[in-house]
Amino acid sequence: MQVLHVCSEMFPLLKTGGLADVIGALPAAQIAEGIDTRVLLPAFPDIRRGVVDAQVVTRRDTFAGRITLLYGHFNGVGIYLIDAPHLYDRPGSPYHDTNQHAYPDNVLRFALLGWVGSEMASGLDPFWRPDVVHAHDWHAGLTPAYLAARGRPAKSVFTVHNLAYQGMFYSWHMNDIELPWSFYNMHGLEFNGQISFLKAGLYYADHITAVSPTYAREITEPQYAYGMEGLLRQRHHEGRLSGILNGVDDGIWSPQNDLLLPMRYDRDTLEEKAENKRQLQIAMGLKVDDKAPLFAVVSRLTSQKGLDLVLEALPGLLEQGGQLALLGAGDPVLQEGFLAAAAEHPGKVGVQIGYHEAFSHRIMGGADVILVPSRFEPCGLTQLYGLKYGTLPLVRRTGGLADTVADSSLENLADGLATGFVFEDSNALSLLRAIRRAFVLWSRPSLWRYVQRQAMNMDFSWQVAANSYRELYQRLM
């Protein structure tokens, strides 16, 4: 079976979010399962530099200008690159300029990605043709539409990593992207009077997956679906919508092998984690105190991630003797709020604005609790890293957080199921109650250690996900 992933980023070449982590790990896991898997990406500068052995496959004139299709390898995975410097050779973010304005030609930049994905199924590379084209998020959303226009030369899967980003463009762009105008209607890619790349993926794909079973259910409800609930409910009834949990890349996230940690450890040597905590406290300007539970945030600072709740609950957390270490960037109001809290509580709150992959490992290896209080969370990887590192996740019961973390309730403790702390309602009071439960467990060190071991025992490997995708592909064939 031959599978092509169509997407816009891939860790470690280029990463703006969790999508990159998935594409950095899933194809390799699928290859290990015996599936001939390749990836198609735009040749953004960082990606182009990383695929050093890229050779020309073909050149084409397209609606978006002249392109060269390249093929090379990265970490044992075959990578196709769409080399179109006039579209992709820009510094910084792949999606917007330095002023955070979306590039005005994004409609062409990402329509081209979908078009090439579809053409691959029609022999664009004469030596390799996919049986399944697997597109990810709105950037690749037109892939299933182009396949439909082509008479469906391959089966298509569309994975929703985050339904909030919809890829909306003015309707007149139908003239620019070489899709029939008949596709522009309610039963197609029209949404609120515009073209939606996301809806194109949802409507035309043979099967839709969400990145967790709970998120797959949630997106059939209005509060999570951003207006797509009718279509998603229909796909659910047709058996064409399912949830497959993301995994964790053991090669990158594993406390016993993590070279970014001052001290490596596993579930049988958890006492070594204390040195990581000490070094993290020093690095973040916190008081070195092994008795104070160290809560951490590694996140984009947005209201989706519920970080306003952390700011609101922070006085209660500090009053009980806790510390906070935060690494993240985003909403300027939240950034200012956390910086002000750090200034007001020296030695108790440490804040680093920005994102540093290496430092996120040090936080995961040194903190006691990782906070993930999201309003919605399709899958979430942060809590999975927390589980792997024995850094107990404190999460809201939504999306993938609900599927992966079991609350340390008395029943779950008795049944050996507890792996963290879970709260229900998206408000500071509910969050504070979960924080209180964390303090109570912290006061019982042997019980805390027991829950850490439970957490580290969970299996969220990519092999599990790769197997689930293989079963899905086989059903479609």
UniProtKB/Swiss-Prot annotation:
One cellular component (GO) term of this entry: cytosol
InterPro entries (UniProt xref): Glyco_trans_1 (IPR001296), GS/SS (IPR011835), Starch_synth_cat_dom (IPR013534)
Listed GO biological process terms: glycogen biosynthetic process
Residue positions binding ADP-alpha-D-glucose: K15
Pathway note: Glycan biosynthesis; glycogen biosynthesis
Family: Belongs to the glycosyltransferase 1 family. Bacterial/plant glycogen synthase subfamily.
Purpose: Synthesizes alpha-1,4-glucan chains using ADP-glucose.
This protein's name: Glycogen synthase
Organism of derivation: Klebsiella pneumoniae subsp. pneumoniae (strain ATCC 700721 / MGH 78578)
Gene: glgA
